[in-house]
Amino acid sequence: MSTTGLSHASDTTRLVIPDLDAGLNFLSRLPLANPLQSEVSLNQFFDSLLQSPPAALTYLNLLEQTRVPLCFVEEELARRYVNKPLPPGDVEAQAFDQVVEVWRKVTRAYSQCAQLDSDADDPEHPLRVALVLHRCLYYTTMIIVEHYRARREIPAGVWLDLHGYYASAEEWGVATYPLADALDPHGRSTHCMAAYVMALLMDVSGPYSLSVRDQGIVRRWATQWAPLVSIHGAEPGEALPPFAVDLMQDTGLKSISDSLNTSQLRRLDTSRLAMVLTQVRQQLAQKLSPAQIGLGEDCSVGHCRRLLDHLARPWTQARAARKFRRQAASGIAKVGAGFEAMHFFISGKEFSQPENVRMYSRQDFDTLFVFRQMDDPTAKLQIQQGTQVARPDEWEVVNQSANGFRLMRSIAGAKIAHGQLLAVCPHDGDRFILAQVTWLMQDRSGGLVAGIAALPGTPQAIATRLLSGHTGKAELYTQAFLLPAVDAINAPQSLVLPVGWFQPSRVIEIYSETPVRVRLDHILQDGPDFERVSYVLEK
């Protein structure tokens, strides 16, 4: 990168930004096609501003010019750790730390800019205060968002920082001061209250239970609808909603029964948001497309309905009754992942091809020939495939309900992903069941915490294969599972297949004791590594 117009300290190679033109020239030459190099350059740029800050107005203008390229670069780097299983590898952990540190650094830069802007008599001063506080709210929220996307626990103090920036906006009287936002794709204005509400809505959406894709959709909707929510102080004797924000607590929106200092409470008026949610759900029921009603073009009607159903209670501050009561528990659960391992744990034996399709290698036949006198001529040919199945990981049971568990584990063990299929032997049982990871987070100590929900029915380990069709090629069987119907919860009989197998009306062959052909009906449940599908017997 050319450094024309820039200077460096004589005793170091540290970059110095002497004026607005030099800073703009530096930013105009960012190699955005190379996000890694752009990250280095932006860090150098922010370090320069923090160590040798220019005049306040110049400082603010330069920071504003970084918003679009900065968010682009960090989004590209986030691809290294977003949607990856836990615990993260070294490359993923390093990328995460880099992105979070940049958000912290730019927040410090805006805060420093505010300290340098001492011209309180300037009529534009309130606008600059509002702008700085909004950006501090935005970038602190990005720290929270990155932790959600990486499924990491929020560090201590981050929520207090966010509350502090919003409280400052209230004190200055600029909480709803309209501000331009270069990051808004529709050119809409925003304000500090909306930025703060967006973070609170994200938090109560249950981000650790959402896929990364759904987190992105929820974040977009929260940004879009946050201006509909207003924040008010707690008046003496006033009835409060079930949830409120305590500005002195290091958490987001929470039950007010836990808050004693009402002077620091802030309540959210979500009545307008509730009306919009009701209207949008009605419009979807009337067959309007998500794009037509402003929900975006990246989600289907069914997907939007499910996500809106998930958000309806928390975003309107209605207490959600648990479908199954959670009870404290203790003990060690055994957990296995991957179809090969799960099949072994559930069946109790290694998987082998059924006799009708079994094929033997030259080594197998050589072994049989050498030891043919030792074989029972009446016995079926048995050749061990030599696969080595890993031992199950051990997880500590924290609590349980009728359909699942909350488990925790140290950092040691196999990687695990949100939505993944697991075979679990409960602490109080002796048989493995199938379950899906529905909630996943890495805590501050590095350990993993997971919520898992059991699939309905007792699984039976079976074999399945695709039919050869017109190719004439014999297909080998692979591991799968059969789940019986559970009438009590209206769960039909189903198959659990590797991801990618389902096609509507596809005919496959399953094998337990004899081969049976079945026609796949529709997907009941899925994840990154499996599909649970209903089926009917092929006539």
Predicted features and spans:
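Short strand-loop-strand
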Residues: Q317, A321-D430, W439-R444, V449-P459, ...
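Extended, domain-scale alpha-helical bundle/helix-rich regions
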Residues: A175-S361
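Serine/threonine-rich low-complexity intrinsically disordered regions
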Residues: D19, S38-S41, E74, P87, ...
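Long, leucine/valine-rich, helix-dominated scaffolding and oligomerization segments
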Residues: S2-L201
